[in-house]
From Swiss-Prot:
Keywords: Cell membrane, Chaperone, Membrane, Protein transport, Transmembrane, Transmembrane helix, Transport. It comes from Streptomyces coelicolor (strain ATCC BAA-471 / A3(2) / M145). Interacts with the Sec translocase complex via SecD. Specifically interacts with transmembrane segments of nascent integral membrane proteins during membrane integration. The keyword Transport applies. GO terms for cellular component: plasma membrane. It holds the Pfam family 60KD_IMP. It is found in: Cell membrane. Residues 421-431 have a biased composition (Basic residues). This is Membrane protein insertase YidC.
Length: 431
């Protein structure tokens, strides 16, 4: 570990300078030789580093989600070129280039803070050995050696012997109890962070090798922390524990406010967002607009939780816009079906359905109602002027016809030897 720390000696001076500046502030409050002054200086160093790494953390989230999305395509490439490793690598790089994904982006925060971690280890190791290093001069060195956190010196390790611990002004029991508790807390925080990531923030609709890797890391990382933690000074354990707690809180914030699409966390988030939007009638924050904008842009590729969210807004008389805003939409209601297609129905007044009548009601006509003429009756034939007496006799003859046809169901029947339908008038020459 000392050899690795020496490789990052170029950053030892900046790290020691930052610690000294924070120690000056906290020393004026708690006293320069107290463990609180030195411990809080290390914690403040962690917070400062992690704030500077927030842009890299955002890039890590995007890269991780991009890798999750590409897992099905990567699996197809591996199966297609399983006997040609070179072609497989070429296709993988081509896929990364087309989608703009960099697999190393997910490791950027860890790689970026590694130099600070080893530089701090180098500084604390110098304090334990009594050597001035970086910005820490002899008076600050003596002050740091006197500082204890819950009875354990900053430079003490779990593996140190009784003589070395006594030279730092502490007992071996106190050092081992404090370091063991910190190692357990460090491993537990790492396990909880990975478990939250696996159970809530992973797309459950796609089973990929990436999920198996994350599940394996959930158990491997805590064991690694426990193994390496016994060789780290108390000050480094404070740094590492603070880093894990920060990561856990940061991950919980991301899971709650910007979850992975298709995960359980996204379903919970969209339920809360739907409740907020229906109460206020709009999206209130920039993050909410970004989520709605991404869902609208997906179109038919929305997952079940996203379709449920869009349909819920439409049923509430709201419509999600392409810019992420939500507006009232009383004219149309769009509902997305299971296959992703959107069906829009316009709100129109209900058409009045005619009252159904039975066969006997249709046949029984009122006495004063005239039966409508059809194309099968003789009334379609051209009529010449006839005497008045003959015209008066026709209604009487026509009045008897309904009684004669009552057994036939009111259906117009053609006479025997006569073709159905309208008849051609007889030629005058045949009369």
């Amino acid at each position: 570990m000392d050899t690795i720390a020496s490789l990052f000696s170029f950053i030892t001076w900046p790290v020691s300078w930052v610690i000294v500046q924070f120690h000056t502030v906290y020393g004026a409050i708690f006293g320069p030789d107290t463990g609180w002054a030195w411990g809080l200086s290390i914690v403040s160093l962690v917070i400062l580093i992690r704030i500077c790494l927030i842009p890299l953390f955002v890039k890590q989230i995007k890269a991780t989600r991009g890798m999750q999305t590409l897992q099905p395509e990567m699996k197809k490439i591996q199966e297609r070129y399983k006997n040609d490793k070179q072609r497989q690598s070429e296709e993988m790089m081509k896929l990364y280039k087309e989608t703009g994904t960099n697999p190393l982006s997910s490791c950027l925060p860890i790689l970026a803070q590694s130099p600070f971690f080893f530089a701090l280890y180098h500084v604390l190791n110098g304090i334990a050995s009594g050597d001035t290093i970086g910005k820490i001069n002899q008076p600050l060195l003596e002050s740091a050696q006197k500082a204890h956190i819950f009875g354990a010196p900053l430079a003490a390790k779990f593996t140190d012997g009784a003589s070395k611990v006594e030279s730092l002004g502490a007992s071996l029991t106190d050092v081992r109890v404090i370091t063991a508790v910190m190692i357990v807390l460090m491993s537990a925080s790492q396990f909880f962070t990975q478990r939250q990531l696996m159970t809530k923030n992973v797309d459950t609709s796609v089973k990929t090798p990436f999920m198996q890797q994350q599940k394996m890391l959930m158990y491997v990382f805590p064991v690694m922390f426990a193994v390496f933690g016994i060789n780290f000074p108390v000050g480094v354990l404070v740094y590492w524990l603070t880093t894990n707690v920060w990561t856990m809180g940061q991950q919980m914030y991301v899971i709650r406010n910007n979850p992975t699409p298709g995960s359980k966390a996204q379903a919970s988030y969209l339920e809360r967002l739907h409740k907020s939007v229906t109460e206020h009638g709009r999206t209130r924050r920039r993050g909410e607009k970004a989520i709605v904008k991404a869902i609208v842009a997906k179109g038919r590729d929305r997952n079940e939780a996203e379709r449920k969210f869009i349909n819920g807004l439409n049923k509430a008389g709201l419509a999600a816009q392409a810019d992420g805003n939500v507006v009232k939409n009383d004219a149309a209601v769009a509902v997305q079906s299971e296959d992703g297609s959107t069906v829009t129905t316009t709100a129109q007044p209900k058409r009045q359905q005619p009252k159904r009548q039975s066969k006997s009601q249709r046949q029984a006509k009122p006495a004063g109602e005239t039966e409508p003429k059809t194309s099968l009756t003789k009334s379609d034939e051209p009529q010449d002027a006839e005497p008045a007496g003959k015209q008066d006799a026709k209604p009487a003859a026509g009045a008897k016809k309904p009684a004669q046809k009552s057994g036939g169901g009111g259906r117009s029947k053609a006479q025997s030897g006569q073709r159905k339908g309208p008849q051609r008038p007889k030629s005058p020459s045949k009369k």
